[in-house]
Amino acid sequence: MDFNPSEVASQVTNYIQAIAAAGVGVLALAIGLSAAWKYAKRFLKG
């Protein structure tokens, strides 16, 4: 197995992008859930 710096760099970039995408997804989910929770509490109180 030979060492190819550009291949390693592209794998690292893909890995970082995957982590960033997951982080954005979790953040969006958390914001959506908190907004839905606030709306639901207001709605249930009447």
Curated annotation (Swiss-Prot):
Species this protein is from: Thermus phage PH75
Function of the molecule: Self assembles to form a helical capsid wrapping up the viral genomic DNA. The capsid displays a filamentous structure with a length of 760-1950 nm and a width of 6-8 nm. The virion assembly and budding take place at the host inner membrane.
Membrane-traversing stretches: 18-37
Alphabetical list of SUPFAM superfamilies matching this protein: Inovirus (filamentous phage) major coat protein
Record protein name field: Capsid protein G8P
Species lineage: Viruses, Monodnaviria, Loebvirae, Hofneiviricota, Faserviricetes
Family in the record: Belongs to the inovirus capsid protein family.
Side of membrane Cytoplasmic, spans: 38-46
Matches recorded under InterPro entries: Phage_M13_G8P_capsid_dom_sf
Periplasmic side: 1-17
Modified positions (N-formylmethionine) in chain numbering: M1
Membrane topology per record: Single-pass membrane protein
GO CC term, one of those recorded: membrane
Subcellular location as annotated: Virion; Host membrane
Oligomer status and interactors: Homomultimerizes. There are several thousands of this protein in the phage capsid.
Keywords linked to the UniProt accession: Capsid protein, Formylation, Helical capsid protein, Host membrane, Membrane, Transmembrane, Transmembrane helix, Virion
Domain of life (superkingdom): Viruses
Broad class of where this protein is predominantly found: virion
